[in-house]
């Protein structure tokens, strides 16, 4: 490599990060997470509220979000511990005077707390979400004492809902499919679960504005119509509050797609800001016809600032917003190069990217990890919106898809997001339903799988083995 080319590459100092394990490989010495961890002590997020108040929904979404931004988080659902300990018969298990059941429930809570300790203290977890009713001051005091003994921070999330229609809808969507009610009559399930709620109501002690004024918490009233926040103490708690104040449960669909095929796509070059190819323009009109056929009410459309997404959106004949955060990943010195040219001029960089595609940062460019941080405001906007179409780019779409489908950082850079295909995401109880719609306009394949040999000393043909044909 020439001296001129060498100067383009980042310095060793800029590439160093703390390895995820104790390995001594050259890559591990150069690896680094550009995103700092904002918690100096592990955090326990404690759910509070009666059954059918959306606690598990909140727990699942919050965990997905925190993992996506790079904070290792895990849900500990007490219902799962209880089902492993004893089979469910009916609501009588939850009667406040059922002493045998009370003992079992406490033992389950202690078992879950033991697993929380293992996760936060021995498995590099940063946030544990304790998903249970935790409706009594006695139970919350037990948790607070546990957290104090182990040096964990505590943040409470209480979900309060008195709207019978919302409660009934939650029971219909979630509880009818619960493992507690397999093969049970629908009406009997509803009757039993309402009686279960009554059992909890007897001893329910909500967080108190005066008695609990020293605690950190957020109260969510009637699925987000009102909030009360108290003593937010650190960055993670602040981000949690911000996130929870943006999510909603209104039925909607999120449409994700890439721009139409571009001129640089045809030439096998990454990045750049070229316009659409002839087939790309054909796709733009096919997309317009598809969106019209969906009959979507109040559709909001977002694009990046790049020509190829704007040209794709123009064909829709709808208003659209340009979001700079949706711009494609910055390939730095590799912008508008083919994979063959990157291998020729920067073989070491090409290998390092294959070794850790999520954290690798292009010289003078970005990593997928950087891109996730850039896209966080987009996620907040998507959570706030109802029906929305996002016309973006391959790396950007992978990051957004990883959030909605709860994919790991290892899976994220290899998610398949082909050209001329729309992904329709419909949020459901604890996840997303995905429909893939190919609009029948041919395009080049831009998906490159991870090659078998990722060593720096590999032969060029091994490095280029998985490069797709661009014709």
Curated annotation (Swiss-Prot):
GO terms for cellular component: 6-phosphofructo-2-kinase/fructose-2,6-biphosphatase complex; cytosol. The active site is at 131, 161, 259 (tele-phosphohistidine intermediate), 328 (proton donor/acceptor). Residues 2-250 are annotated as: 6-phosphofructo-2-kinase. Keywords: Acetylation, ATP-binding, Hydrolase, Kinase, Multifunctional enzyme, Nucleotide-binding, Phosphoprotein, Transferase. The record marks 393 as: Transition state stabilizer. GO terms for molecular function: 6-phosphofructo-2-kinase activity; ATP binding; fructose-2,6-bisphosphate 2-phosphatase activity. InterPro entries: 6Pfruct_kin, 6Phosfructo_kin, His_Pase_superF_clade-1, His_PPase_superfam, P-loop_NTPase, PG/BPGM_mutase_AS. Synthesis and degradation of fructose 2,6-bisphosphate. Homodimer. This is 6-phosphofructo-2-kinase/fructose-2,6-bisphosphatase 1. It comes from Bos taurus (Bovine). The gene is PFKFB1.
């Amino acid at each position: 490599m020439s001296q001129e080319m060498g100067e383009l590459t980042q310095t060793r100092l800029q590439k160093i990060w703390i390895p995820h394990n104790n390995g001594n490989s050259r890559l591990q010495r150069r690896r680094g997470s550009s995103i700092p961890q904002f918690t100096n002590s592990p955090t326990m997020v404690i759910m509070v509220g009666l059954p059918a108040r959306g606690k598990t929904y909140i727990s699942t979404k919050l965990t997905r979000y925190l993992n996506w931004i790079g904070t290792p988080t895990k849900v500990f659902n007490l219902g799962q511990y209880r089902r492993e300990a004893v089979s469910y018969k009916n609501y009588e298990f939850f009667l406040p005077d059922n002493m045998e059941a009370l003992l079992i429930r406490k033992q389950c809570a202690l078992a879950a707390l033991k697993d929380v300790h293992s996760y936060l203290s021995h498995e590099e977890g940063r946030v544990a979400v304790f998903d249970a009713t935790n409706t009594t001051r006695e139970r919350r005091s037990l948790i607070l004492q546990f957290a104090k003994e182990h040096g964990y921070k505590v943040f409470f999330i209480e979900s309060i809902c008195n709207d019978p229609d919302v409660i009934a809808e939650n029971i219909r969507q979630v509880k009818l499919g619960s493992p507690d009610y397999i093969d049970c009559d629908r009406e009997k399930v509803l009757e039993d679960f309402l009686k279960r709620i009554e059992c909890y109501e007897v001893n329910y002690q909500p967080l108190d504005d005066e008695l609990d004024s020293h605690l950190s918490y957020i109260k969510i009233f009637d699925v987000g119509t009102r909030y009360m926040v108290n003593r937010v103490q650190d960055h993670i708690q602040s981000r949690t509050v911000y996130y929870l104040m943006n999510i909603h449960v209104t039925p909607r669909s999120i449409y994700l797609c890439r721009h139409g095929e571009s001129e640089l796509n045809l030439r096998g070059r990454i990045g750049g800001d070229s316009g659409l190819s002839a087939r790309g323009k054909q796709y733009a009109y096919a997309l317009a016809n598809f969106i019209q056929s969906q009959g979507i009410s109040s559709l909001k459309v977002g694009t990046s600032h790049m020509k190829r997404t704007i040209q794709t959106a123009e064909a829709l004949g709808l208003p659209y917003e340009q979001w700079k955060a949706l711009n494609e990943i910055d390939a730095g010195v590799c912008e508008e190069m083919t994979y063959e040219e990157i291998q020729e001029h920067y073989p070491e960089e090409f290998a390092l990217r294959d070794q850790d595609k999520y954290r690798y940062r292009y010289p003078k460019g970005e990593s997928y990890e950087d891109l996730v941080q850039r896209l966080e405001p987009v996620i907040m906007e998507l959570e706030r919106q109802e029906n929305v179409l996002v016309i973006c780019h391959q790396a950007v779409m992978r990051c957004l898809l990883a959030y909605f489908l709860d994919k790991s950082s290892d899976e994220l850079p290899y998610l398949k997001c082909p050209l001329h295909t729309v992904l329709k995401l419909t949020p459901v109880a604890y996840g997303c339903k995905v429909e893939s719609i190919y609009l029948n306009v041919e395009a080049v394949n831009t998906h490159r799988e991870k090659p078998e040999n990722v060593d720096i000393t590999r032969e060029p043909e091994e490095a280029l083995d998985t490069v797709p044909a661009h014709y």
